Amino acid sequence: MDVTEKFDLIAKPPTEEIVTKDELIELLKTNSKPKHYIGLEISGFLHLGSLISTGFKINDFIKAGIDCTVFLADWHTLINDKLGGDWETISKVSKYYADAFKLVCPRVKIVLGSELYDSKKEYWFEFIKFTKHMSLARTMRTLTIMGRTENEEKIDLAKLLYPPMQAVDIHSLDLDIVHAGMDQRKIHMLVREIFPKMKWKVPIAVHHKLLPGLSEPSDYTDSKILGKMSKSDSKSGIFVHDTDKEISTKIKKAWCEEGHVENNPLLEISKHVLFHEFNEILVERPEKFGGNVTYTNSSTLESDFLQKKLHPSDLKQTVSNYLIKIVSPIREKLTLNEELFQAIKKSA
């Protein structure tokens, strides 16, 4: 596989941004096995965005010859009060996350935050060195990476450790590529600003599209981040443990206004999930409604929907059919005992 083919794999949807493209091309030319990571909090049930779309993107990196790691941030999970801040539950759910990503991305490496900190004695020394380059105000502004805002009344001191820890994780893993959803962009830009000052390796940042929730968007100010599928809201997305019937019901109820393409969750799912895995999508409908039609790319599908050549009910049925094909095999192989299921559900 040549450099262009590798680049195209990394750049294909759901990738939304590469910082920078020229640096990535140079990396692919000069490094036969670049090191990648994506860091994840261990919180609620895995869903279409957090596991499947993310996992598909990781597989693109792997196909391009990249050495990929999923970093399960157990300490960050504790800091951010996820799973009730219970360490035993966090540890158990970490195993569930590891099993899930190994299932979807068989060749990925799994690293726990606690394992990294235990094995790297210089971590906290490097952490202090990094924080000397951060002001309190800048730290507060980066809290959006953990779903917080700088204006929240109750921000405990531990939460201020989260952004610099995430940055030092990147250095400690000696990464060439940092990968995340668009909601993590601030920390990656901070890394690219501060690392050169410290003479640390500066990674390329690759950000993928965050799948929107299934309800109508309530805020359009930043469609790249707001309204994403949430692990804490069972109605907002498709979860890997949803039954075929639950998937079908959720898609039928999803917001999908006729002719409206902006922030349309079903068009986003089609583009970033369905067309990632299927070369063509067949819409089955009676002859009186135009008959069957096959789409080979998301642009044509979106164009027909915009022009009202494709009705929302037909799009919903099609998305439901193909999602079931993707989710069902994962659900059948990914076991989750009742005790752990209830623990996650309780803390959601």
State the predicted function of each range.
Residues 1-212, 216-217, 263, 278-348:
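NTP-dependent nucleotidyl-transfer catalytic core
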Residues 178, 193, 222, 232-234, ...:
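Domain-scale selection of a single, long terminal region
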Residues 227-296:
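Internal helical hairpin/lid segments
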Residues 85-87, 222, 270:
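Short secondary-structure boundary/capping segments
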Residues 204-233, 237-238:
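Active-site and channel-lining beta-strand-loop segments
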